[in-house]
């Protein structure tokens, strides 16, 4: 008899690895150059001033400063304000140095 059994368990039971997408730094948090602010698929959030856009649409900080989210024409935009970051970035580096 040329029939298959009805179990089908070998076709099920797969799952993809977690991609850990989302906002990594929220508004008014301090960032240093190169820190990831948003991991996303596509440009749900657009890059603003002092941030870069990676080829996988990751938004990262290009300078030290404070993260700022805003909306323009119904589009979310993230930027980094440099005026606050200079003093705080030095403090973060000192704190991380003492933590190790």
UniProtKB/Swiss-Prot annotation:
It comes from Cyanidium caldarium. Keywords: Chloroplast, Plastid, Ribonucleoprotein, Ribosomal protein. GO terms for molecular function: structural constituent of ribosome. Belongs to the bacterial ribosomal protein bL27 family. InterPro entries: Ribosomal_bL27, Ribosomal_bL27_CS. GO terms for cellular component: chloroplast; ribonucleoprotein complex; ribosome. The gene is rpl27. This is Large ribosomal subunit protein bL27c-1. GO terms for biological process: translation. It is found in: Plastid, Chloroplast. Pfam families: Ribosomal_L27 (PF01016). It comes from the Eukaryota.
